[in-house]
Amino acid sequence: MVPQPSRIVSIAPLHATPWPNPCTDPTHKPMHVSLRSSLLSLATSLLCLTQLGLATASAQAPIPTRKEDFHLYLLIGQSNMAGRGAVPPDQKPHPRVLKLDKENKWAPATEPLHFDKPIAGAALGTSFAETMAAAAPESVTIGLIPCAVGGTPLSRWEKDGDLWKQALARLEIARQHGTLKGILWHQGEADSTSTLAPTYGKRLAAMVSDLRTQILSPTMPFVAGHLGTFIVESNPNGTPNLWRKINDEIDTLPSNVPHAAIVPSEGLGHKGDRLHFDTAALREFGKRYAEAMQRLQKASAPAR
């Protein structure tokens, strides 16, 4: 049986002025021995044990003892990776899916997964992880490493960029506990200009190669998704929005770097702004990412 994430219980104080704590206060003197004092002593002992348990209980969710059983996935890109979907009110996180939170602690994968902006919401990472968990042995837990930041260009994710460094720092923490199994990427809206779009494919391929070199894994599976097909053709200032060109550039990735796959966005809807996928679309998108990841992993698995 897989252990359920632990929950920390907080106890509200009963008095505005705290009583002396017999567990920690050296000045506390025991009462004369009597039935009443014996009962008080028993209650005090139970209180001490409770306080000790609360004090030593970790805020971090339980993780597998073997790194091989903790499959990690790095989530990078901009807002459509971070997620802007409406968060369901009745969340029931998968018992074998965790996220590395903003405090760099493992926690149940409730949404929002990301914390880049207050508007972070439902994301494709949730259904991706649930699909991967369903296909994995019961001993395996999926660990998500959310690093996406809305509104960011590819340049900030390239080698030695600020977001490159932040993602690698969080990845290093996560890899102390598990094994990286793949990287998920969704970005390009910020690069859909006449100056940036034509070189997007080459720059993305270079970023993937540099990232793999940095993490010492030249065949790490990398899955990228298309931008939404609902994006407007021109920006409010009248300049063309070259999202179609970005998608064409993304399509060149598998021919430029090995062990890469592309996920289409056809048929997926937006949340009303013609920019961000809605929750239903993100759920489907995440499943598509998982299917692409599984194909890459199967293709790169050693022959038996």
Predicted regions and their residues:
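Extreme N-terminal basic, low-complexity initiation segments
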Residues: 2-11
